């Protein structure tokens, strides 16, 4: 009797397991179960039995860190904006800069010009000052008016000593362009002459020629000697412009100089003086 009861229980369990196995495979075919092995099922059961993990609540330290990060972003944006404003040209700043050197008559005169040159680290006789004056379209040597300053510095985008210092190399490079050099050379004549005179006095002419041609025209020292011993007291604009053309086109031995060409008498006399000097 006992044996029959045990067999009945065993058969009942086996039948139940077979039914469960059949149901599982049916669900599997219908994609209603995960394709996992027995071990995974055990893990899944365990995980379903475990309660879900709670999200960690932010602490006071987290709040401070987030606040500091936001503040840092604000500071970085403000700093970037300040840099942009400092780099951008400001007419107001340019005007304030002008009055560091100008007198009560709204003109930078000799004293202000001396301080200005000292601040930008350039000697007043440096050729870069001539280029700057040309950029400002200054009308009188040693003077910058308010209008010239604002217009010229605006074109250079300079509203401070530091910005102009950083632009000096650019101003020097302008002389390397033949067209710009010719414009500056012609400008220099009117810039340097007395406004009630049509010509340059000889001493001023020699200084300006030395500034513009002294380092690029090998014959300049000889030409300067010629001027010193000549009868000339002034140089007119036609003579001035032809000296530049002469320096650019005539060979150093003067072999291609045409005495019948349209050169001014000044240069005819220089060529004659030079040849006599070479022969003696």
From Swiss-Prot:
Under the cellular component aspect of Gene Ontology, which terms does the record hold?
Answer: nucleus; ubiquitin ligase complex
Q: Where is the DCUN1 domain?
A: 89-275
Q: What does this protein do?
A: Contributes to the neddylation of all cullins by transferring NEDD8 from N-terminally acetylated NEDD8-conjugating E2s enzyme to different cullin C-terminal domain-RBX complexes.
**Complexes and interactors:** May interact (via the DCUN1 domain) with unneddylated cullins.
**UniProt keywords, alphabetically:** Nucleus
Q: Which InterPro entries match?
A: DCN-prot (IPR014764), DCN1-like_PONY (IPR042460), PONY_dom (IPR005176)
Enumerate the Gene3D superfamilies for this protein: Cullin, PONY binding domain (1.10.238.200), EF-hand (1.10.238.10)
Protein name as annotated: DCN1-like protein 4
This protein's superkingdom? Eukaryota
A biological process term (GO) from this entry: positive regulation of protein neddylation
**Region listing for Disordered, in residue ranges:** 37-71
Which GO MF terms are attached to this record? cullin family protein binding; ubiquitin conjugating enzyme binding; ubiquitin-like protein binding
Keyword Membrane carried by entry: no
Q: What is known of its domains?
A: The DCUN1 domain, also known as PONY domain, may mediate the interaction with cullins.
Q: Where in the cell is it found?
A: Nucleus
Please name the source species: Danio rerio
Chief localization class?
nucleus
